């Protein structure tokens, strides 16, 4: 029988152990922003050292393969790149932002960072809903990310019905959680959370539907993404989670949209090689037709490895397929001609001679799923697609599924409505090339990144033009209520070719038309064949391109 004294000693010991654990937790989560970057980086390197050999092997493979194909890791060689015809023909793709950030479903896909920004809406919401960031950090959402209703086959079927020709899921976002079966990390969807190779399943399902498959990597941004968490008591400061949270350096950024030469954020050679190895791993495992990168690949410390990756990927794509791959880049990260420029949430004011792409989200607020979201209309998406295609570009439209793997009904309906329009009018979009002018009409497009919602409503006088062989397509962006349309660019007095025939896609009506000095006058039927926009197939007495 134990004495009261023995019990008191035991209780005291338990109390001391508990206090020690609390003190350790407080110390481990204490702010570390004042530590020097090299020390912080060494902590990440040590935490992820179990994969050093695998990383080094992939980097070595990249450097060897850079000497085994037509491309070399320098800009002069990379600028001989030519965009594959399939990509120019495709016009419309689906982007997917899906990850652990879909669990809190608050703010936007930058929740993993903003939840640590003291005073932000995400910071306040996180404390109210889950507790303080040193007790419940971003990592603690991972077990809640179950994806129990995720069906890659159902997604792929929907994307095909939407009229998309390629699909690009985010393989790893800024948060550092890989959505694929990586051999370079324990923090992956294949090993935690859903315990499924999401990217592998999507690759198989998308290709089974006859669509092209790509991946998006935002691994490089993880270098700084969670650095703000070092300014408050948080789990990011705890070295036992460094393999997931990464270096988490302080972001010393220059203004967005300009060259990153003056971005002084600390980037170690180890991180640059980790980024290169992760990219090479995605190429080797999934043979993507497209690799999409966000803006930070232009950071000065990354650029030497960027040319290595580009040469490796282009050479590899020629080995495993019948065409060279496509790299999407932003701003000034890559040299002109070496890849495909991407404008985030933006459009151009005129035809660009080099092929380009816009990526935007069907959501008005976020790239990932959030509660109480609002969405773009089918008309908005279709009009944007038409305008971009007329200017020699593609549209990559993003969706954000819920954490359980379901796609909101509102999003599905937008995609299906776009697909229904393309089913009738696709000849005016797929496989087309720009005409001598992109279009006409009074409505001016708000050009540049992050302006895609600034364009005012189109009028019946607004048209966009595309060509295919000797056919011109004139796409009207609003149906005239009086049934009469005039295409000024086809006036005889401004060099318009003699028009032979005009057909309204989706209609059996025989159109009456008259080519006059002020334009091509058309009498349209009482009812438009489709909502949102209509397409006219125009042929000429002589070859269009003579």
Residue ranges and their predicted role:
Residues 2, 22-24, 95:
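Intrinsically disordered, low-complexity regions enriched for glutamine and histidine
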Residues 2-13:
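Bacterial N-terminal signal peptides that target proteins for export
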Residues 11-24:
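Bacterial N-terminal signal peptides
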Residues 8, 19, 101:
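Alpha-helical and His/Cys-centered functional microenvironments
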Residues 26-546:
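Mature catalytic domains of secreted/periplasmic carbohydrate-active enzymes
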């Amino acid at each position: 029988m134990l004495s009261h004294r023995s019990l008191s000693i035991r209780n005291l010991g338990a109390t001391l152990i508990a206090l020690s654990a609390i003190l350790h937790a407080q110390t481990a989560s204490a702010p570390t922003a004042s530590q020097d970057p090299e020390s912080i980086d060494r902590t990440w390197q040590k935490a992820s050292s179990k994969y050093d050999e695998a990383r080094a092997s992939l980097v070595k493979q990249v450097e060897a393969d850079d000497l085994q194909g037509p491309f070399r890791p320098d800009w002069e060689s990379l600028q001989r790149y030519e965009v594959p015809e399939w990509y120019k023909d495709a016009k419309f793709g689906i982007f997917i932002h899906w990850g652990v950030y879909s669990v809190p479903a608050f703010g936007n896909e930058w929740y993993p960072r903003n939840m640590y920004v003291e005073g932000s809406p995400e910071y306040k919401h996180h404390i109210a809903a889950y507790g303080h960031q040193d007790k419940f950090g971003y990592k603690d959402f991972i077990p809640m990310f179950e994806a129990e209703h995720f069906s890659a086959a159902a997604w792929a079927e929907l994307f095909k019905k939407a009229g998309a020709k390629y699909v690009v899921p985010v393989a790893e976002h800024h948060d550092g959680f890989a959505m694929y079966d990586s051999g370079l990390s324990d923090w992956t969807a294949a090993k935690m959370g859903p315990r499924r190779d999401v990217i592998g399943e999507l690759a198989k399902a998308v290709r089974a539907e006859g669509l092209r498959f790509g991946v998006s990597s935002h691994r490089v941004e993880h270098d700084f993404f969670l650095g703000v968490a070092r300014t408050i008591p948080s789990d990011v400061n705890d070295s036992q989670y460094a393999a997931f949270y990464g270096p988490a350096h302080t972001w010393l950024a220059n203004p967005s949209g300009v060259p990153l030469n003056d971005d002084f954020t600390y980037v170690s050679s180890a991180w640059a090689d980790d980024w290169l190895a992760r990219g090479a791993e995605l190429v080797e495992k999934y043979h993507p037709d497209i690799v999409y990168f966000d803006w930070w690949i232009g950071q000065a410390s990354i650029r030497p490895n960027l040319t290595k990756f580009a040469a490796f990927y282009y050479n590899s794509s020629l080995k495993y397929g019948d065409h060279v791959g496509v790299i999407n880049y932003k701003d000034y990260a890559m040299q002109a001609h070496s890849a495909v420029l991407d404008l985030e949430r933006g459009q151009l004011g005129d035809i660009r001679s080099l092929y380009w792409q816009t990526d935007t989200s069907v959501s008005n607020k976020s790239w990932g799923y959030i509660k109480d979201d609002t969405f773009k209309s089918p008309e908005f998406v279709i009009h944007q697609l038409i305008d971009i295609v007329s200017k020699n570009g593609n549209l990559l439209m993003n969706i954000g599924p819920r954490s359980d793997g379901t796609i909101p009904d509102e999003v599905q309906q937008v995609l299906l409505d776009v697909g229904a329009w393309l089913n009738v009018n696709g000849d005016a979009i797929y496989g087309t090339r720009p005409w001598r002018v992109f279009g006409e009409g009074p409505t001016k497009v708000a050009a540049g990144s992050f302006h895609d919602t600034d364009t005012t409503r189109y009028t019946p006088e607004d048209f966009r033009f595309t060509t295919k062989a000797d056919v011109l397509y004139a796409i009207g962006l609003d149906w005239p209520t009086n049934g009469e349309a005039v295409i000024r660019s086809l006036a005889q007095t401004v060099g318009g070719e003699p028009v032979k025939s005009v057909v309204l896609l989706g209609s059996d009506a025989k159109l009456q038309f008259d080519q006059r000095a002020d334009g091509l006058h058309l009498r349209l039927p009482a009812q438009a064949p489709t909502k949102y926009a209509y397409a006219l197939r125009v042929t000429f007495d002589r070859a269009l391109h003579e």
